[in-house]
Design a protein with these regions (language model features):
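Conserved alpha/beta-hydrolase "acid-adjacent" motif
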Residues: 188-194
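Conserved HGGG/HGGXW glycine-rich cap/lid loop of the alpha/beta-hydrolase fold
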Residues: 2-47
């Protein structure tokens, strides 16, 4: 199922608390190499999911099919959009999917709920300091920048993302377009097992992996893994 992204508008959605700056750096190089037109909407923390869906709808308004994807919650929302609009999507790029179906006690959902509660109870400065103390330096720097920019609506975005119902295994089995997946083998918040489950469920999917150290040294390693998985189909 060959995929050609040349000239295709490709919309990438950021993860919860992350931003369009990071997702652009992660995906733009590999996608430009493939000839794609890269669009990375700025998250709207006061209406995270609705804002993402509106951005996808806007990109598809010209009538030309688009490629969609993102990181974590961005991967889930874009995949759900592709499932609802099979004639408007040509491919999905799903990096670090966090859970399948109901969020339940998935690590990313628990982390987002905890951070939202801490932000509301202790404030931004204390929560950022705690995040920095428990994160690799590269991730702490990324999230410090994006969290500051998304305050004071950040806890609302985190709570909304933590309640989001991702595509189920049964729904993924109905995905008609090819899907390239990327997982970090040592990421405790986005377990690689979730990406493996998505890849097994979808009809036309491939999975490539990276490590957190590789992502920290060069964000484009994540996007490159995702694009390479898609292009091998």
């Amino acid at each position: 199922m060959a995929v050609n992204l040349r000239g295709v508008t490709t919309v990438l959605l950021a993860g919860t608390g992350s931003d369009d700056d990071y997702v652009y750096r992660a995906f733009s190089g590999p996608l430009h190499d493939a000839g794609a037109i890269v669009v990375t909407p700025e998250p709207q923390p006061s209406r995270l999911i609705a804002g993402y869906l509106a951005a996808l709808d806007d990109a598809a308004r010209s009538g030309a099919p688009i490629a969609v994807g993102g990181v974590s919650i961005g991967a889930a929302v874009s995949t759900a959009w592709a499932l609802r609009h099979p004639s408007r999507a040509v491919a999905v790029l799903a990096a670090l999917p966090a859970w399948t179906g109901e969020p339940g006690n998935a690590p990313a959902a628990l982390t987002a709920r905890h951070s939202a509660r801490q932000l509301r109870e202790e404030g931004l400065a204390a929560t950022v300091a705690a995040m920095q103390a428990g994160s690799p330096p590269w991730l702490a720097a990324e999230l410090t920048r994006s969290w500051l920019a998304q305050w004071p609506d950040l806890p609302d975005a985190m709570a909304e993302a933590a309640a989001y119902v991702a595509p189920t295994v049964e729904e993924l089995a109905t995905l008609t377009v090819p899907m390239g997946l990327a997982a970090a083998v040592d990421d405790p918040v986005h377990p690689a097992d979730v990406a493996v489950e998505w890849a097994a469920a979808a009809r036309h999917a491939a999975l490539h992996t990276v490590t957190l150290d590789e992502m920290g040294a060069d964000p484009s390693r994540l996007g490159a893994a995702c694009v390479a998985a898609l292009l091998e189909l």
